[in-house]
Amino acid sequence: VEELKEHAKNVRRNILRAVYSGQSGHPGGSLSSADVLTYLYFEVMDIHAENVKGIDRDRFVLSKGHITPGLYGVLAEKGFLSEADIETFRHFGSKLQGHPNMNYIDAVDMSTGSLGQGVSCAVGMALANKLDGNAHRIYALLGDGECQEGEVWEAAMAAAHYGLDNLTWMVDCNHLQIDGRVEDVMNVYPLDKKFEGFGFEVIKACGHDFD
């Protein structure tokens, strides 16, 4: 646990360096997801330098694509990006764009940005693994504000229909979106009951507690 905490601290440092260097970005959502991303990349997912370019590994989709400082922060801590790369966030010609681009970074599995599309892509990737007999898992991180998008629920319905038990979604419930509090803009809660209604097995957890 102490090692994970140290990684998470470094990820947060990378987030702040990226946002400061680019003088733009979304630090709030990146910081609220830092521990989840750290846990995924250092404790859960099968992804490392030797398999990052292949298909024989777990895959991650950042559906809330605007929090790239968080994704780049953990990729740098994992060794897929350098500290020098972090300093180029949102600079002209940089591969570290404001939204993730799978054409520029090997460890980025899906280009995202339009909310709701990432989880739909994750469903397709999980279904493809099923059809190919690939036992590796697909993980996706989405936001609670993102759950206002109808495409999220179409994807949830498809995941249940196809029995995608190789798919894991994580919802960052920080209760905030760009227009204000989620409950005030368009209340999506209780999310656990909604996802259970779509056939998901739901686990509620504190996203900042590695225990």
Regions found by a protein language model. Give the residues of each.
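Non-catalytic, mobile gating and regulatory segments of ester bond hydrolases
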Residues: 1-3
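N-terminal capping segment at the start of a domain
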Residues: 8-24, 172-174
